Amino acid sequence: MRLNAPQDFKRCFLSRKRIKNVAFTLHYVENSGQIARLGVNIAKKKIKKAVDRNKIKRAAREAFRKGHFKGIDIVLILKNEKFYDQTKCFKMINEVFNDLMKR
């Protein structure tokens, strides 16, 4: 399921729980339900082509789906476009989600 409402994004940012790597920041907060939700934020300023932004979003959704998370809201933000190479980017996304599963 996806995060859509601005107040849900705000709640994740205010929780101060986050995981960082070179290219991404992942904010998370527990929610009251049993459903995990994901929001992906990739600025057009950082990745110009919509095709590339969508590839990153699809990779994030796939890593999220494979993680089998329950009762958590997650927001993934691209913070550094210099590291945008498709294979590196997908590895970094998986790395961030694996770190979250360990916590």
Model-derived regions, located:
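Positively charged, solvent-exposed patches that mediate nucleic-acid binding
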Residues: 1-103
